[in-house]
């Protein structure tokens, strides 16, 4: 046997052994035999580096120091899930599904508490792994994901596919990692999720390989070739992916709830952390029929487990002003450990929330983390509230008190008493600019409407530079606050006039950081226009809405001149967003700001736009069967270039099916529905 054949044999053998060990949990060889074969392969590859295969198991052992992580733009939108916290909320979601789908069936899966990622395979080989990021743009973490031993570098079939899943750190590995960190004098990780996220952002791949991350894959992001979610998961197992076996088929709310109760009981016994249950409509065609909101699919929901709670005391309440002028109360509390992190502050939302719960200073309260993330005050422990005291105070000479008759002097030694009042003082003036606060009838928030309020301007600048908006690395809240205080910037357009010399006048900003910030500002000019639109901070316009708006109007200038009626025609966007967008661009200064940003060289075009004037413009097309000339990704790109929306399943909304060889149930269903059928050659002839 020649060397190339031997390397091929060893690579295939070791990959099969790894599949049996990590995926099937049925090892067929002893560790010693695996190690012997592995070291034999390492030696042969070192002597013959030109023969190393892309799926070699030696890629998993680390040894690469990365310079950083580059951005990766996902070809498919990676939506987050809506969530519910009770059976009643779940019932409302299920009721909405039943209004659209007759006798829906569901798949219930455990919600893994880890880091979401996407894996891209071409011809069966792993070519890219990326974090979800904001659902549109993530980070390329391919080298690190290759060090996760249960991620197949080569699939059982030579196909193109994009899959979504969760990377997590098993509890046993988490305990081992923290024990090692304590011995080294390093701070322990707060929880396995933080450890998993931190591990995947390591620049040294040896550290990733050592920590023992694992994965569960659960969704095909590229157009699916199966008819149900259940079939997708079974297909993933056949391809070599790790799929969570803890799942249940359900036909109604009662059966869904049975699985949730079972998952709740199992939660502490599992070798990994979960934070809920994901419920999905099983039929993929029905998923497509239900569609999406701006942020999430209508065909799936996440039930979140009741949050862990802790008792603490409210010490005081701060009021802060956000970028839209909303004044938000935050409780300062006695620090307490909650969900494995120390919490000393919690949001109180708004005045109504404080008054409804009768929250007072020095109250004992129960706090929890909504979705295990944001600390919130849940319940006031009224039985532990101390009765109000009478305070006695002696005023010295030359002091004054206010009475309804005006100010009067207090003689030395005069004593008076008053009743202690621990109720939270509701502000009537903005804590930043002293303008009168307004409480609009249709809102629960207190709002500062002064457009020159320094807090609002500062927060708008911070939002503009943030990761989900223009992503200007290095330009964080501290730097922006200093720039604003020194009057070096007064609006977002001023950021594009900054120089290294300007930045060097700030505290803790040295030459290297200043150069990095100026470079990041310059790079942000090339961002797609939906990032800029989101960065402008228009009320009700989040990242998803910004993308939908720019997909429709293609250019920020065109959007700025659109009417409410035109915007309201966009699916998933309502009148509230339309009114907010039109109102923003009608305000004094909006046109001037756009002119300044355009003159500064910012991109106003939506970079994801396709030619929508093609012969398939607005048509929904499904690919099915085996293509002999085109790769599936090439066929999809060709269809999209012709204006088509490529879907993964056949429904009444499908306009056309392109059927290759061995097309199965999708072709049959299309024929039953009378949908137009094309061959691969028909597509090639265009």
UniProtKB/Swiss-Prot annotation:
GO cellular component assignments: cytosol
According to its UniProt record, which residues of this chain constitute the active site?
Answer: 111
Could you tell me the EC number(s) of this protein? 6.5.1.2
State the CDD domains in the record: BRCT_DNA_ligase_like, LIGANc
A GO molecular function annotation here is: DNA ligase (NAD+) activity
The entry's function note states: DNA ligase that catalyzes the formation of phosphodiester linkages between 5'-phosphoryl and 3'-hydroxyl groups in double-stranded DNA using NAD as a coenzyme and as the energy source for the reaction. It is essential for DNA replication and repair of damaged DNA.
- What protein does this entry describe? DNA ligase
Cofactor(s) the protein needs: Mg(2+); Mn(2+)
Q: Where is the BRCT domain?
A: 611-686
Q: Where does Zn(2+) bind?
A: 430, 433, 448, 453
Q: What Gene3D superfamilies would the database entry show? A: 5' to 3' exonuclease, C-terminal subdomain, 6.20.10.30, BRCT domain, DNA ligase/mRNA capping enzyme, Helix hairpin bin, Nucleic acid-binding proteins
Enumerate the InterPro entries for this protein.
BRCT_dom, BRCT_dom_sf, DisA/LigA_HHH, DNA_ligase, DNA_ligase_AS, DNAligase_adenylation, DNAligase_N, NA-bd_OB-fold
Q: Which residues cross the membrane?
A: none
């Amino acid at each position: 046997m020649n060397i190339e054949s031997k390397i091929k044999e060893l690579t295939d053998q070791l990959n099969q052994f790894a599949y049996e060990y990590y995926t099937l949990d049925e090892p067929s060889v002893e560790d010693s035999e695996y190690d012997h074969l592995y070291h034999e392969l390492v030696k042969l590859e070192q002597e013959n580096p030109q023969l190393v295969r892309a799926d070699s198991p030696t890629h998993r052992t680390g040894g690469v120091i990365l310079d950083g992580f580059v951005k990766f733009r996902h070809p498919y939108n990676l939506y987050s899930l809506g969530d519910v916290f009770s059976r009643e909320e779940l019932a409302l979601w299920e009721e909405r599904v039943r209004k659209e789908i007759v006798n829906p069936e569901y798949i219930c899966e455990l919600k893994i508490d880890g880091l979401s990622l996407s894996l891209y395979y071409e011809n069966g080989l792993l070519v890219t792994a990326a974090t979800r990021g904001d659902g549109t743009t993530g980070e390329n973490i391919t080298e690190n994901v290759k060090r996760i031993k249960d991620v197949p570098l080569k699939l059982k079939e030579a196909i193109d596919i994009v899959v979504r899943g969760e990377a997590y750190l098993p509890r046993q590995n988490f305990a081992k990692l923290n024990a090692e960190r304590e011995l080294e004098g390093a701070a322990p990780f707060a929880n396995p999720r933080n450890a998993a996220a931190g591990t995947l952002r390591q620049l040294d791949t040896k550290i990733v390989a050592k920590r023992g991350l694992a994965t569960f894959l659960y969704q095909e992001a590229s157009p699916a070739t199966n008819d149900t979610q259940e079939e997708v998961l079974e297909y993933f197992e056949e391809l070599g992916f790790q799929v969570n076996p803890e799942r249940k088929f359900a036909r109604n709310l009662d059966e869904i709830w049975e699985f949730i109760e079972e998952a709740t009981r199992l939660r502490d016994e599992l070798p990994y952390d979960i934070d809920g249950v994901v419920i999905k409509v099983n039929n993929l065609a029905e998923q497509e029929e239900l569609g999406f909101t701006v942020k999430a699919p209508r065909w799936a929901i996440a039930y979140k487990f009741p949050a862990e709670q802790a008792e603490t005391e409210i010490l005081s309440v701060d009021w802060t002003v956000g970028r839209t002028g909303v004044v938000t109360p935050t409780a300062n509390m006695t620090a307490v450990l909650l969900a494995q992190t120390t919490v000393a502050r919690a949001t109180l939302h708004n005045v109504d929330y404080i008054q409804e719960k009768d929250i007072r200073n020095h109250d004992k309260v129960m706090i929890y983390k909504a979705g295990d993330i944001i600390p919130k005050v849940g319940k006031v422990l009224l039985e532990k509230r101390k009765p109000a005291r009478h305070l006695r105070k002696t005023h010295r000479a030359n002091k004054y008190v206010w009475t309804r008759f005006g100010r009067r002097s207090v003689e030395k030694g005069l004593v008076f008493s008053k009743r202690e009042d621990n109720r939270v003082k509701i502000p009537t003036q903005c804590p930043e600019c002293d303008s009168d606060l307004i409480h609009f009838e249709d809102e629960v928030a207190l709002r500062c409407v002064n457009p020159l309020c320094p807090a609002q301007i500062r927060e708008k600048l911070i939002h503009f530079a943030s990761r989900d908006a223009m992503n200007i690395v290095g330009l964080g809240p501290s730097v922006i606050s200093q720039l604003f205080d020194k009057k070096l910037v007064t609006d977002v357009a001023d950021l594009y006039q900054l120089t290294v010399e300007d930045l060097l006048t700030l505290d803790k900003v040295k030459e290297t950081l200043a150069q990095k910030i100026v470079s990041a500002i310059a790079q942000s000019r090339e961002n797609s226009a939906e990032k800029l639109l989101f960065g402008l901070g228009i009320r009700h316009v989040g990242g998803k809405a910004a993308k939908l708006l720019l997909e429709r109007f293609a250019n920020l200038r065109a959007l700025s001149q659109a009417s409410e009626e035109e915007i309201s025609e966009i699916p998933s966007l309502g009148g509230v967003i339309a009114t907010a967008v039109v109102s923003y661009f009608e305000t004094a200064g909006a046109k001037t700001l756009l002119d300044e940003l355009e003159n500064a060289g910012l991109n106003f075009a939506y970079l994801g736009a396709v030619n929508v004037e093609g012969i398939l413009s607005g048509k929904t097309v499904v690919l099915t069967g085996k293509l002999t000339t085109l790769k599936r990704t090439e066929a999809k790109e060709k269809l999209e270039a012709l204006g088509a929306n490529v879907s993964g399943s056949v429904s009444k909304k499908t306009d056309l099916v392109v059927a290759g060889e061995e097309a199965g149930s999708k072709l049959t269903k299309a024929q039953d529905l009378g949908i137009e059928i094309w061959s691969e050659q028909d597509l090639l002839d265009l």
